[in-house]
C-alpha cells in the first residue's frame, strides 16, 4: 500500500467520526427518561390488575367445578333446590340494582324540582308587612229598655200560680216592686211564658178599625146582535155512538145433551170447543198437553187417581 493511499483512507474514516454540526437538534435525555419511568409504572399497575383478575377467575373456576361435581352427585330434589336458590339470588341482585338506580333518579328529580321552586319564589320586597292591630269595640253599654207596664189586675190574674195563691199578699207585693223597677219578673212556676203573654196582650189592646163602606155600581148588560137576521140557528144532527174497534168473539152455544144416563160417570162431558174441530186428528205429542183431571179416564201407566 502506498503512503498516500493509506493517508487518504484514514482521513476519510476520521472525517466520518467528527462531532455533529450545529444543525442537528440536541436530545433531552431527562424528559425521555421521566416518560419511560411513568410508562413503566403504568405497565406495572396493569400487570398487578391482570394478576388479580386472573386469580379471581381461577377461584371462580374452582368453585364452579365443585358445584358441578355436587350437582352430578346430588339427587333430583337437591338439584332442583340448588337451581331455585341460584335463580332467587340472581333475581335479588337484579332487584337491588334497580332499587339503587330508582333511588338515584328520585334524588336527582328532587334536586331539580327544588331548584325550579327556588327560581319561582318571588323576590323579597322592601315594603315591611305588619299585621293590622286588633280593633276593640269601645261602645258604651246600654241598659235594657223597660217593658211596657200592663194593668196590674189583669197581669196578676193571668199569671197567678198555685204557689202565689197559697202565699197570698207577699207574692203580689213582690210583683208590684218588679213592675215599678221596669221589667216584670214572673215566678219560676208560671203557667205561661213571658213572650206569649206580651204578644197576647198586644193583640188584645189593638183597636179594631171598621172598614169603610164602599158602594159598587153594576155595569149595564149589553146583548150582541145576531150575525144573521133570520130565525134561530138549526140544531146539529146528533152524533152516532162510536163503533168499537175490536169485537168480542162469540163462542158457539153448547150442544144439547140428550141423555146424561147414557154417559159413564168416569168420562168427561164433551166441551163446546169440540164443535169447532173439523177433523179427528190426534194432537201432536211435541206440544204441551192438558193435565188430566179427576173426571178423565184412568191412565194405563198411572196407578193412582188425581
UniProtKB/Swiss-Prot annotation:
Keyword Kinase listed: no
Location in the cell: Nucleus; Chromosome, Centromere
Any GO BP annotation: meiotic chromosome segregation
Gene transcribed to yield this protein: sgo-1
One protein family per Pfam: Shugoshin_N
Keyword match Coiled coil: yes
Protein name (database record): Shugoshin
Coiled coil spans: 28-75
UniProt record similarity statement: Belongs to the shugoshin family.
Compositionally biased region (Basic and acidic residues): 133-161
Keywords: Cell cycle, Cell division, Centromere, Chromosome, Chromosome partition, Coiled coil, Nucleus
UniProt cross-references to InterPro entries, sorted A to Z: Shugoshin_C, Shugoshin_N
Any single Gene Ontology cellular-component annotation: condensed chromosome, centromeric region
Biased composition (Pro residues): 230-241
Polar residues composition bias: residue spans: 167-181
Chain residue ranges for the region called Disordered: 122-196, 223-306
Function (record text): Plays a central role in chromosome cohesion during cell division by preventing premature dissociation of cohesin complex from centromeres after prophase, when most of cohesin complex dissociates from chromosomes arms.
Amino acid at each position: 500500500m502506498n503512503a498516500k493511499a493509506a493517508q487518504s483512507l484514514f482521513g476519510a474514516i476520521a472525517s466520518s467520526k467528527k462531532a455533529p454540526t450545529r444543525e442537528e437538534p440536541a436530545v433531552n435525555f431527562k424528559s425521555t427518561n421521566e416518560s419511560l419511568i411513568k410508562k413503566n409504572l403504568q405497565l406495572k399497575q396493569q400487570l398487578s390488575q391482570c394478576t388479580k383478575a386472573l386469580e379471581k377467575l381461577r377461584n371462580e373456576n374452582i368453585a364452579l367445578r365443585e358445584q358441578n361435581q355436587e350437582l352430578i352427585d346430588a339427587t333430583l330434589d337437591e338439584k332442583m333446590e340448588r337451581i331455585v336458590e341460584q335463580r332467587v339470588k340472581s333475581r335479588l341482585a337484579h332487584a337491588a340494582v334497580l332499587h339503587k338506580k330508582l333511588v338515584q333518579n328520585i334524588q336527582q328529580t328532587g334536586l331539580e324540582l327544588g331548584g325550579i321552586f327556588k327560581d319561582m319564589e318571588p323576590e323579597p320586597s322592601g315594603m315591611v308587612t305588619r299585621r293590622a292591630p286588633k280593633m276593640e269595640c269601645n261602645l258604651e253599654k246600654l241598659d235594657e229598655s223597660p217593658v211596657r207596664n200592663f194593668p196590674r189586675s189583669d197581669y196578676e190574674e193571668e199569671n197567678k200560680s198555685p204557689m202565689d195563691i197559697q202565699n197570698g199578699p207577699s207574692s203580689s207585693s213582690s210583683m208590684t216592686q218588679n213592675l215599678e223597677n221596669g221589667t216584670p219578673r214572673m215566678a219560676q212556676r208560671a203557667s205561661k211564658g213571658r213572650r206569649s203573654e206580651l204578644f197576647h196582650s198586644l193583640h188584645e189592646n189593638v183597636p179594631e178599625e171598621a172598614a169603610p163602606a164602599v158602594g159598587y155600581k153594576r155595569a149595564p148588560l149589553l146583548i150582541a146582535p145576531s150575525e144573521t137576521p133570520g130565525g134561530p140557528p138549526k140544531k146539529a144532527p146528533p152524533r152516532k155512538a162510536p163503533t168499537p174497534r175490536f169485537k168480542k168473539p162469540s163462542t158457539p152455544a153448547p150442544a144439547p145433551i140428550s141423555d146424561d144416563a147414557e154417559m159413564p160417570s168416569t168420562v168427561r162431558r164433551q166441551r163446546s170447543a169440540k164443535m169447532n174441530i173439523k177433523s179427528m186428528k190426534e194432537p201432536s205429542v211435541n206440544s204441551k198437553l192438558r193435565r188430566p183431571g179427576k173426571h178423565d179416564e184412568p191412565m194405563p201407566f198411572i196407578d193412582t187417581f188425581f
